[in-house]
């Protein structure tokens, strides 16, 4: 016989309007549940506990069938005792049945994290059709993946539930010239939060125990009406996209560096209020060490629609991959963080037939800097302990207005320069480049451009300039008359000879004749080895090509540096590559070259033996 205690199931709503208790008579149990759908919803609700305490009054409705076929309806209020109930004997089936019911009700709560003390308290207010919408309160949300689109939070995930990190966000907007009520989002856990309103996308805290705050203040102008303040405070460090501050893709790697940004703009001829972004953590910036003292100070002024825009100041920017296009310094990277390097950039431009003022770029770091306006491409400092300074001053001619180019560079020690596919190796020599350039722009002759002082210890590609070169240590010739046909290579001595030829700058310019003394700068073994390695790679590619045009292969073999023994090794290597790809015609031609090298070596040996005999 079933006991009443084992089969009491309660249906609880917010006002306890109805509940259910089975009625037992003559060992026949037939029950009717009031509002069964509500019962199922409450069973799946996380607010319902596994074993609720029964109330004092339960409104029961039941139908009882007796053996004689009669049906009676009981609709009464039963007093249920809350104290100790009498113990009754239970059968094995009843015990199994009751235990399985309890396991099912408790199974969905067994995996719940009880130690996590993270709470989501979300309060949101909106205005719909000029009427205040009632409060939408989402409280005590558990710390797992939930979609809270109403609060502007998508794909939230708690990484560390024991970290005490709080996001306090206050947002105000103007819609249809009506003030929208405050939308307050507070006490968000540290996780990936998508705050499109705050211009923060894909935030991820790297270190949850770091105390870093983002204090953001923003004001905008919309339809000539001042927008109310949008205050975003105490935001955790992470991937933050602050396009207004010109700092994209930020990631906190050093918790001690702050970005102080002040910006002003003019929209439709009206000055916009101050857009102030302060105490922002460093972003996707290449900072591998903490001991670096590097500062970027940028100053910029522009003219828009005939009105002078307010000063846009970007100060105290940490070192790294920063795109300062207004200052003409993209893709900057500091390789040595123990060097004290400062970027002071000042730029002013005026358009629409107004003379531009001096554009001055001073004390630029020795890094991978692309100064296209200064005529320098791909400069790289190899020795980071060397103190290097770049002083650049430039003016240009546009629309028949005179702009003077004036550029200066101060560098030290050794030069290895590539000019018109020509490599120069100068060991232990100090070389000075004095460069003078004149160009015709719109019928006006700009003043002389001058590049002075010593050259750096790196490869510099300055193909746009015609550079007269003055070198020390018996290495002096004029590059103004240099062209590709003037480089005469001597295979026997591994030297280049520079001759005298006519050189014309362009089709319309008169030919320029320059005299230069013939010098033979030797190529070092390291440089020769590098050239041969490049030739080897090119030979492999040429052999793999389709077709029977092998002219390029023999040109590369003639450009090899070194003795005949080295050339023989490269010819044998090329033959092996041709055998791999079954190039029969190429193999036959290379075998002829190999025979010529062998005969040449044999003749040199014979001459050497004759000299020895004569000496004896």
From Swiss-Prot:
Residue ranges, compositional bias (Basic residues): 86-106
Single GO cellular component term: integrator complex
Descriptive protein name: Putative SAGE1-like protein
Disordered as annotated region, ranges: 69-110
Gene: SAGE2P
Compositional bias per record (Polar residues), positions renumbered to this chain: 69-85
BP terms from Gene Ontology: snRNA 3'-end processing
């Amino acid at each position: 016989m079933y006991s009443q205690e084992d089969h009491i199931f309660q249906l609880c709503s917010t006002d306890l309007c109805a509940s259910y208790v089975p009625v037992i008579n003559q060992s026949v149990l037939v029950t009717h549940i009031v509002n069964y759908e509500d019962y199922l919803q409450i069973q799946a609700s996380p607010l319902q506990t596994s074993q609720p305490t029964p109330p004092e009054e339960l409104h029961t409705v039941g139908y009882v069938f007796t053996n004689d076929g009669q049906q009676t309806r009981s609709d009464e209020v039963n007093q249920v005792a809350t104290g100790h109930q009498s113990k009754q004997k239970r059968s094995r089936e009843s015990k199994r049945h009751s235990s399985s019911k309890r396991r099912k009700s408790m199974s969905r709560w067994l995996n719940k994290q009880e130690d996590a003390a993270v709470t989501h308290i979300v309060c949101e207010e909106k205005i719909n059709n000029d009427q205040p919408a009632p409060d939408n309160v989402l409280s005590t949300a558990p710390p797992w993946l939930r979609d809270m689109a109403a609060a502007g939070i998508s794909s939230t995930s708690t990484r560390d539930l024991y970290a005490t990190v709080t996001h306090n966000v206050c947002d105000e907007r103007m819609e249809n010239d009506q003030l929208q009520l405050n939308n307050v989002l507070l006490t968000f856990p540290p996780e990936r939060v998508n705050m499109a309103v705050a211009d923060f996308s894909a935030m991820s805290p790297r270190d949850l125990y770091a105390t870093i705050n983002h204090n953001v203040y923003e004001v905008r102008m919309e339809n000539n009406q001042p927008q109310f303040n949008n205050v975003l405070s105490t935001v955790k460090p992470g991937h933050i996209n602050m396009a207004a501050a010109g700092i994209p893709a930020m990631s906190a790697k050093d918790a001690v560096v702050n970005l102080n940004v002040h910006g002003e703009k003019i929209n439709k001829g009206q000055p916009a209020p101050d857009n102030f972004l302060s105490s922002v953590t460093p972003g996707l910036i290449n900072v591998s060490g903490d001991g670096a003292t590097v500062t970027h100070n940028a100053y910029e002024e522009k003219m828009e629609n005939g009105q002078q825009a307010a000063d846009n100041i970007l100060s105290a920017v940490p070192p790294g991959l920063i795109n300062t296009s207004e200052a003409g310094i993209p893709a900057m990277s500091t390789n040595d963080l123990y060097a004290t390097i400062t970027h002071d950039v000042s730029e002013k431009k005026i358009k629409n037939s107004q003379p531009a003022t001096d554009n001055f770029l001073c004390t630029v770091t020795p890094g991978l800097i692309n100064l296209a306006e200064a005529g320098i491409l791909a400069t790289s400092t190899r020795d980071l302990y060397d103190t290097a300074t770049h002083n650049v001053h430039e003016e240009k001619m546009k629309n028949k207005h005179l702009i003077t180019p004036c550029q200066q560079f101060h560098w030290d020690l050794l030069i290895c320069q590539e000019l018109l596919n020509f490599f120069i190796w100068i060991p232990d020599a100090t070389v000075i480049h004095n460069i003078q350039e004149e160009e015709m722009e719109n019928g006006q002759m700009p003043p002389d451009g001058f590049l002075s002082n010593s050259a750096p210890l790196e490869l510099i590609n300055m193909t746009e300039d015609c550079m007269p070169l003055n070198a020390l240590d018996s290495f002096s010739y004029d590059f103004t008359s240099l062209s590709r046909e003037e480089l005469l290579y001597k295979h026997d001595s591994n030297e280049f000879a520079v001759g005298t030829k006519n050189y014309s700058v362009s089709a319309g310019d008169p030919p320029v004749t320059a005299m230069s003394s013939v010098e033979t700068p030797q190529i070092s073994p390291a440089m020769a080895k590098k050239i041969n390695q490049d030739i080897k790679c090119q030979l492999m590619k040429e052999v793999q090509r389709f077709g029977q045009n092998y002219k390029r292969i023999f040109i590369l073999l003639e450009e090899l540096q070194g003795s005949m023994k080295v050339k023989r090794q490269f010819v044998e290597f090329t033959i092996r590559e041709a055998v791999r790809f079954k190039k029969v015609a190429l193999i036959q031609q290379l075998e002829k070259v190999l025979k010529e090298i062998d005969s040449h070596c044999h003749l040199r040996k014979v001459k050497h033996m004759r000299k020895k005999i004569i000496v004896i």
